[in-house]
């Protein structure tokens, strides 16, 4: 999975690490990668087949917890409608905008709103059994996730 990540995303993570060294402990490491998977959507478009999934890893800096989230493409609508964690992306530096429609790939930097950071800092998230998304794909939830 690590090979699927681009060098450009790695460069984005370096700037986050530099900010972290300057004392900002509230930053999150966010990694995501696409991989082939054919499955039926469990949500409102029941029976619709999607050829890809995107694996998203959210890891608060300084903590040894890592949260996985898997969404079927197109995943922007799924994040907005189904998940408690709302994401925003800033692909061109023109300003943060809500995720909607297709998101091109790992070269985009991802940001979380301050309200969502409070959600992640909540002590209940330290339990290993909690999932970020209430809608889980039962066919894939048993798969082991590999570190990126």
From Swiss-Prot:
Stored InterPro entries: Birna_VP5
Pfam family, one: Birna_VP5
Top-level taxon of the source organism: Viruses
Similarity comment: Belongs to the avibirnavirus/aquabirnavirus VP5 protein family.
Chain's role: VP5 is not required for viral replication in vivo and its absence does not alter the virulence characteristics of the virus or the establishment of persistent IPNV infection.
Protein name: Protein VP5
Natural source organism: Infectious pancreatic necrosis virus (strain N1)
Gene that specifies this protein: VP5
């Amino acid at each position: 999975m690590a090979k699927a990540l681009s060098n450009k995303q790695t460069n984005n993570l370096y700037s986050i690490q530099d900010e972290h060294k300057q004392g900002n402990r509230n930053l999150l490491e966010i990694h995501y990668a696409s991989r082939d998977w054919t499955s039926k959507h469990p949500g409102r478009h029941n029976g619709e087949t999607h050829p890809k999934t995107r694996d998203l890893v959210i890891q608060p800096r300084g903590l040894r917890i890592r949260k996985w989230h898997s969404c079927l493409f197109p995943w922007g609508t799924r994040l907005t409608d189904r998940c408690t964690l709302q994401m925003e992306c800033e692909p061109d530096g023109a300003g943060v905008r809500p995720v909607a429609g297709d998101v091109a790939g790992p070269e985009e930097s991802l940001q979380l709103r301050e309200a969502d950071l409070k959600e992640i800092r909540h002590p209940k998230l330290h339990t290993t059994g909690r999932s970020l998304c209430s809608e889980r794909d039962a066919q894939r939830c048993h798969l082991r996730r590999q570190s990126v």
